[in-house]
């Protein structure tokens, strides 16, 4: 459950409106989203129908009907976040989010997670922000009554199930989340330092959503009950149901399960409390995990829906986004201080902030960076910007708006967000129009009002021992760091088999889970395919739910076509392809893309290079024309090539200190062997990237860029004939040539297990990567092994690994296992981040689970696995991304479009004996690589107790630059 899962960033601003009471019990509303592209006269019309009604206890309910797929999203949002906490109990709103998933009186042990594992849900989850907490998942529509019953149980019949032991265990889980996302990450403490200094002491935004380790540990059971009784009440909640369902039936269920939950005390909205600075503040911190000096500059901003929020959104993008932006021109191109500058306007319910973030090249003095920022601002004041600049920003907002509506869950999030913070789900229409109405004068006015010459908070986060790089007159930031000890289990707790509690009275028996509705019959999308005269294969699916088209052109090769002594060529080439064409400068190409509101990206992977495009349907042909120009008329700009190399080297430097990146890169070396091409990261190494020339890129392009190894996949509001006609120029101009895709010998799985350790001194967590090189996705056992893995580690909260290491012991925030592969063998891997002082205990428990799994896999496990995998098929083609993935499987592996039915047949017929044998064969703990990335001084020697011999320190495998 993420602390800040910004799934709602569809519209770039949200702001506060005064609360008003809805007295209408039921209202039928239609919001017509009419968005005018600022670069064209055409309009795209799209409407979202919704119905809103309010129960007598104050629960606000919103329905949105969408019958395009047999799925329904359910989102329950509470108007409470960390801003409602008090000092000394920070992190409590987020802790409570975790607790609400664990158990309720009638759902029983495992709560919604356990039910989700049976009904085919997309994974029950939640998120906490400063101002709201939400709980959500998408389910097949036959499970809607079950979800309504479950959400009501969580709201009204939960609190008695929380015991001292339950609270103690979940504290450990949340503290692990903080270690993983904050304490063990480069720049993880930056937001803490900024907020503590931007807002005055006691301000609701002066502490972090996740809180402090000390405050989390001090939370009491009475705190939990008080928080629940105050904030988790119907009159502080919004329930959204979106998807394919019967409205009248859903209303009956909602009344049945929610009506008798009592209304809580009335809740007054928080008053706006904008930040205010009398003078600038400068802080610094020596970061153990940073390899690049980072500068943040943060100014006080405005709250949600403030009239100036819209112009500030556009201002920050004009200043930092793209090659015409003054910050990019000065810091990246002129001064060569960094590869990227990020600037954004952030709005919360009662205040906001305007942030600038840049990570400079290694060894760069941040005083030079600050001077360059000021120079960029001066340039903006002198030169301003054009109407076309303004229009391209607005065009991007329009496309992003529609992209955010691709799933019923995305629509549910929007409706809930606007209902809570604007008291009107339909405010989204006005919100967009306010963005589109921003003028040049508005932008310059807010620049002068909020940025120019105004005080700010600046933070210098530098690698340890490099304080010579910090801003002058900076004071050391106060950051509390956890001390690492050799071993220990943290707070002890014992979770009973059954929790004893007093039942909450109800007018009817809630203990029986409702039955399924009519079983949905998901339709497999109709696929069309053709081969162009030049040899490129094209696969498509028509989908008219949204006025969008998404497509990709994939060329076999990528890293596999590179020389191991010169890796990184395909990655640099992919990056350079969007940096201008023969007929367009980098700035002109970027502007042409943005004026269409389109997105075009090129990226290189281990086995392919992909050109991906996304646009409004009306702009598809113009977007494709730009893709054609990018592919066939590269610019090979020497200046852009050098900038791309600098950026890549900076990325490599940062990865060298990130424990998760270290784990991934080291695991691949151990899987494939040091000299195998697939053991390398596609971005290359310091040594190889420094030596790559522009001629290397041209040679790679001239040799390997051919329609003979290309497939196109396209999904959206466009038919087959239109697509084929649009490809005529590419078919004619792109000539076929033979490209040889090499076949590599793949190493065998190890005959015995070995423990490897990569030392990251003072790491607050240990990153685990256990596994071996298994099989390709085309192997007959691949999907069967995936079925086997569901209960082991692929089923989220339903899996053994999660239940034991997270729910049972509190060792980790998350752990998973899975098979990955393509037409060549991929690994089986187990990955997690665990508290440092239980590194051995975690590894030993994983080993035990693997050893016992074949013999302990039960008929009930098999039935739950089958139920989930069969029922979850209802939602597997909901989004354009999932449809593109289907087309990729068909084109890459030669599968028929109905391969999904074959997989369903496999699920239905697999037996317990087969699963047990698959586990013995493909999840054998005695034939694996056991890699740990963490603090060797306190943890490495203990791992010899696993019984796999003395751990091998692998830092020496990676010499400087390699």
Where are the regions that the model predicts?
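Short, conserved secondary-structure transition motifs
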Residues: 174-181, 273-286, 393-404, 615-616, ...
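A common structural junction motif
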Residues: 152-162, 257-265, 374-384, 630-636, ...
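Proteolytic maturation boundary segments
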Residues: 38-60, 246-287, 294, 329, ...
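Bacterial N-terminal signal peptides
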Residues: 25-35
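Short, Lys/Arg-enriched N-terminal segments with co-localized hydrophobic residues
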Residues: 3-16
């Amino acid at each position: 459950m993420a602390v800040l899962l910004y799934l709602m960033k569809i519209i770039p601003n949200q702001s506060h409106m005064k609360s008003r009471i809805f007295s209408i019990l039921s209202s039928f509303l239609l919001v017509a989203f009419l968005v005018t592209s600022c670069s064209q006269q055409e309009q795209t019309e799209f409407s979202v129908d919704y119905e809103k009604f309010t129960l007598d206890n104050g629960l606000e309910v919103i329905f949105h009907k969408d019958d395009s797929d047999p799925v329904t999203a359910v989102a329950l949002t509470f108007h409470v976040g960390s801003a409602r906490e008090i000092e000394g109990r920070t992190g409590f709103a987020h802790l409570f989010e975790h607790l609400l998933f664990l158990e309720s009186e009638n759902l029983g042990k495992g709560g919604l997670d356990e039910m989700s594992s049976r009904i085919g849900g997309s994974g029950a989850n939640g998120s906490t922000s400063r101002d709201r907490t939400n709980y959500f998942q998408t389910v097949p529509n036959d499970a809607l009554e079950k979800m309504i019953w479950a959400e009501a149980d969580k709201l009204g019949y939960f609190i008695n199930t929380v015991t001292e032991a339950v609270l103690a265990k979940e504290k450990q889980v949340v503290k692990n989340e903080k270690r993983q996302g904050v304490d063990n990450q480069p720049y993880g403490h930056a937001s803490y330092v900024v907020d503590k200094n931007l807002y005055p002491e006691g301000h609701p935004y002066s502490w972090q959503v996740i809180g402090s380790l000390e405050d989390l540990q001090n939370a009491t059971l009475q705190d939990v009950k008080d928080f629940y009784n105050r904030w988790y009440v119907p009159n502080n909640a919004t329930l959204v149901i979106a998807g394919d369902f019967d409205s009248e039936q859903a209303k009956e269920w909602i009344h049945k399960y929610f009506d008798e939950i009592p209304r809580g005390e009335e809740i007054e909205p928080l008053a706006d409390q904008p930040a205010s600075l009398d003078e600038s503040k400068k802080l610094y911190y020596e970061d153990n995990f940073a390899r690049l000096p980072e500068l943040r500059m943060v100014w006080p901003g405005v709250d949600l829906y403030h009239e100036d929020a819209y112009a500030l959104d556009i201002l920050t993008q004009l200043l930092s986004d793209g090659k015409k932006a003054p910050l990019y021109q000065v810091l990246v191109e002129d001064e060569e201080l960094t590869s990227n500058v990020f600037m954004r306007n952030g709005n919360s319910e009662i205040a906001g902030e305007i942030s600038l973030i840049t990570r400079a090249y290694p060894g760069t003095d941040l005083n030079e960076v600050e001077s360059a920022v000021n120079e960029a601002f001066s340039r903006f004041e002198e030169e301003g910007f054009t109407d076309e600049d303004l229009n391209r920003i607005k065009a991007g907002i329009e496309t992003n708006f529609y992209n955010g509506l691709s799933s019923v869950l995305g629509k549910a999030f929007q409706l809930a967000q606007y209902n809570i913070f604007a008291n009107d789900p339909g405010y989204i229409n006005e919100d967009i129009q306010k963005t589109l109405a921003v003028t040049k004068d508005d932008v310059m006015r807010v620049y002068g009002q909020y940025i120019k010459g105004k005080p700010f908070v600046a933070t210098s986060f530098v690698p340890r021992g490099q304080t010579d790089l910090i801003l002058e007159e900076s004071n050391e930031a106060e950051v509390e760091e956890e001390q690492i000890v050799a071993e220990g289990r943290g707070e002890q707790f014992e979770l009973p088999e059954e929790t004893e509690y007093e039942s909450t009275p109800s007018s009817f028996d809630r203990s029986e889970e409702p039955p399924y509705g009519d079983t949905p019959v998901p339709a497999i999308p109709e696929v069309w395919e053709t081969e162009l005269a030049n040899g490129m294969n094209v696969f498509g699916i028509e989908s008219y739910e949204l006025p969008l088209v998404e497509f990709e052109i994939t060329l076999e090769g990528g890293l596999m076509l590179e020389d191991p002594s010169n890796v990184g060529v395909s990655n640099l080439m992919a990056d350079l392809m969007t940096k201008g064409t023969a007929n367009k400068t980098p700035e002109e190409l970027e502007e042409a893309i943005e004026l269409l509101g389109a997105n075009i990206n090129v990226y290189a992977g281990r086995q392919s290079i992909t050109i991906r495009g996304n646009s409004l349907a009306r702009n598809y042909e113009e977007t494709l024309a730009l893709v054609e120009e990018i592919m066939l008329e590269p610019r090979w700009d020497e200046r852009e090539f050098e900038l791309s190399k600098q950026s890549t080297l900076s990325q490599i430097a940062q990865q060298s200190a990130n424990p998760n990146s270290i784990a991934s890169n080291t695991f691949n070396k151990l899987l494939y062997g040091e000299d195998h091409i697939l053991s390398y990261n596609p971005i290359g190494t310091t040594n190889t990237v420094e030596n790559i020339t522009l001629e290397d890129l041209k040679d790679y392009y001239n040799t390997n860029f051919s329609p003979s190894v290309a497939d196109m996949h396209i999904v959206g509001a466009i038919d087959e004939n239109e697509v084929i006609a649009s490809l005529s120029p590419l078919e004619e101009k792109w000539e076929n040539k033979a490209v040889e895709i090499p076949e590599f010998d793949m190493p065998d799985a190890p005959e015995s297990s070995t423990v490897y350790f990569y030392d990251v001194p003072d790491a607050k967590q240990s990153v685990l990567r256990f596994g071996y090189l298994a099989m390709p996705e085309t192997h007959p056992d691949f999907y069967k092994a995936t079925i086997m893995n569901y209960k082991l580690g692929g089923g989220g909260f339903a899996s053994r690994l999660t239940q034991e290491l997270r729910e049972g012991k509190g060792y980790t925030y998350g752990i998973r296992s899975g098979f990955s592969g393509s037409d060549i063998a991929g690994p089986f891997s187990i990955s997690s981040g665990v508290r440092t002082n239980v590194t051995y205990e975690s590894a030993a428990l994983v080993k035990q689970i693997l050893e016992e799994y074949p013999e302990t896999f039960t008929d009930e496990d098999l039935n739950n696995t089958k139920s989930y995998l069969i029922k979850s098929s209802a939602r597997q083609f909901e989004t354009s991304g999932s449809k593109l993935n289907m087309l990729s499987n068909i084109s890459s592996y030669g599968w028929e479009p109905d391969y999904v039915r074959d997989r369903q047949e496999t699920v239905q017929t697999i037996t317990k004996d087969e699963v047990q044998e698959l586990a013995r064969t493909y999840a054998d703990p005695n034939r694996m690589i056991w890699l740990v990335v963490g603090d060797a001084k306190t943890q490495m020697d203990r791992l010899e107790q696993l019984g796999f011999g003395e751990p091998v320190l692998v830092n020496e495998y990676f010499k400087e630059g390699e």
